[in-house]
Structures are given as structure tokens and as C-alpha cells.
Amino acid sequence: LRDLPLEWRGSFAGMSVFMCHGKPGNNLWGLYRDHISNTLLDMMLVSLGVDVLITGHTHMPLYVRVRRGCVVNPGSLYTFHNVRVTSHTYGVLSLPDMTFELYDLTVPVGERILPLT
């Protein structure tokens, strides 16, 4: 992990993508749904010049479609050895249609988890 870049920019299926650990410009802070608006997320995509922003850091899943594209956080499979919360989730983002499927390791196989909005 040490050798991975802090940020990555590229394209998949004709869609421009920006990935970072936290939020663009600051990998020590994350995007929490109750602290961000769709307008702010749309502005982030516009300022980055991308269709898709993939983030992490919070260990909580996030999927938001906005006018410009979408913002995704798949959550985390990591288990902490303290009281910190983690989601035990991972996700699959399909491009170019920007659909996102979230999988939860704590839910029995075959059971659906609630979709993110």
C-alpha cells in the first residue's frame, strides 16, 4: 500500500474517474453523507473535471448520483481491533451506466441489503 499514489486519475468505459483515500485535496478527511449536499458533490466533480469520484477514509458506504456524475465510497472490509465502526462492505461500480451494487459481508448470501440513495 505504501507504494500506491495518494490520488489517481484515469478513465474507464469512456468515463473520467478520480480516486483518492479521503476527499480531493485532503486524504485525512472523508465525505460523510450528513455533511455534504448534492450541490457540493456536483461542484467537486466539476472542479475535478471528472464524471466519477471514488473515495474512502470513512469506512462507510456512500453512493450519490448528481447532475455531473456520481460519488462513491464502497465502505470497508477491514475490521478494527477497537471501537471504531466499519461497514464490512465492498461495492461494484458499473460504467458507463454508473450503477453501484453494494455487498455486505455480514448479510447472508442471497439476501439483499438496502440500496444507497
Residue ranges of predicted features:
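Short, acidic/polar N-cap/turn motifs at the starts of alpha helices
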Residues: 5-9, 60-61, 88-90
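Active-site neighborhood of phospho(di)ester-bond hydrolases with catalytic His/Asp-centered motifs
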Residues: 19-20, 51-57, 71-75
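N-terminal start-of-chain detector that recognizes signal peptides
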Residues: 25-26, 42-46, 62-66, 72-74
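Short solvent-exposed loop/turn micro-motifs enriched in small/polar/acidic residues
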Residues: 1-3, 55-57, 84-86
